[in-house]
Structure formats: C-alpha cells, structure tokens
C-alpha cells in the first residue's frame, strides 16, 4: 500500500504527534493527502520542553491543528517504579488519553508514526498500540526511517535531519525509581549540552547524583576537548559527571 491509498481510505484521523521525524512526516503526509487530521501532543514529565516547542512550531508551519494534553505520567506506580515494562505502560496510558481526547473531537481513528524499521522486540510500546487498535500507516506502507528522512528532505522540511531523541526516562536504568527532580536534572543537564553546541548525546543517570555523558563519534572529540567546561556546567545537576570515552552509536 502507498500512503496516498491509505489516506484515500482514512479520510479523517487523530495523529499521535511527538514532533520527531516519523510523526512529523505522518502529519505532513496527512496534510498533503488532504486528510481531516488533528495532531495530539501529550506533555508529561518524560518530554523536555524543547520537544513541545518544536512540535508546536512544526504543526503551525503546516497549518495543522494541534491539541496539547498535559498528563502526570508519574502518577502511575508501574511507570514511576521504572520496570522493564515501563514503555508498555507509558504508551498505553498516553494512547488511551489521545483516544479519549480524539473521541471528544469526533475522531474514531488514531494514527502513530511507527515505521517499517522499528523492531517490535525492542519496542514494548508497540504491543500497547497494537492492543488499542492504533494504526501505523508508515509501517503499513513499508516506509523505513531512511526513506522517511529522504522524503522529508525532498519536501524541504528541516526536520529531515533531526537527531533521534528518546524520552527522558530512557536515561535512567531500569529499577531506579523515576521522580520529577531526577528527570528535571537530566533535562537541565542536556539543555546545558545543547547550549554548548552539541546536538546528539545522552546524559545517562548512574545514580541520583552521578551522570555519564555519551556523545556520537562526530562530537566526542569536541566534548573531550571541552571536558572541564562541560563538567562545570552540569555540576549543578549531578555531583559527579563523567564523559564516556566510547562513542555512542548514532541512531538512524
């Protein structure tokens, strides 16, 4: 199936929108193929503020309606305790929230940006979207992440080369409880790295007061050259800060 055929079938839909590459392309495709669609962004403690800002700007650039739903994800004990099933519980809670909001707006179909490159074994959240009946047109149409980036580039949309960015909870090892303070410290630490000019990195939590900073190969040497400045800028958020000498793998 091609996307034009999908949207010939699905004339109106709610779109779970994160502002990332995949859901941005899905929103663009809905606009291009004249689907009566509305984007829904769920703001929890897991999403940094810049992601909301970028999502709002992108939706506005397409002149597509966007609803922002605020949600206390840490109110769910099974999520806050950060078990290996956290992603499943989180995705389930967020999608149920979107379904409820979409229904109030008259939408019965919810779409998300899962693509053909996503590995179901590595993404517990895919189980939740399957259970809830969310449709994933990019995956149904066989579009890979590489193809999606190429199509966004061809459409001259700057999001085409946006680095992959997972939620703040992924910085914390399973079994370490999640709190607003800990997640806020991670966000502030990563904002400090953005301010220093870095764009593809992770501030991993080793303990409540220790962070391990990981950079992709093209940025690691610069980070090591600036190590003293980096440690100084992040020390307000973590007592101990280290830079991983091994480059992190760049995600597609």
Model-derived segments and spans:
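ATP-dependent adenylation/nucleotidyltransferase module used to activate substrates
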Residues: 1-154, 195, 211, 228-238, ...
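Short, structured loop/turn "capping" segments at alpha-beta junctions
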Residues: 144-145, 149-150, 157-166, 199-200
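C-terminal boundary motif of the adenylate-forming
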Residues: 197-206, 244
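Internal, active-site/partner-interface "lid" segment
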Residues: 162-182
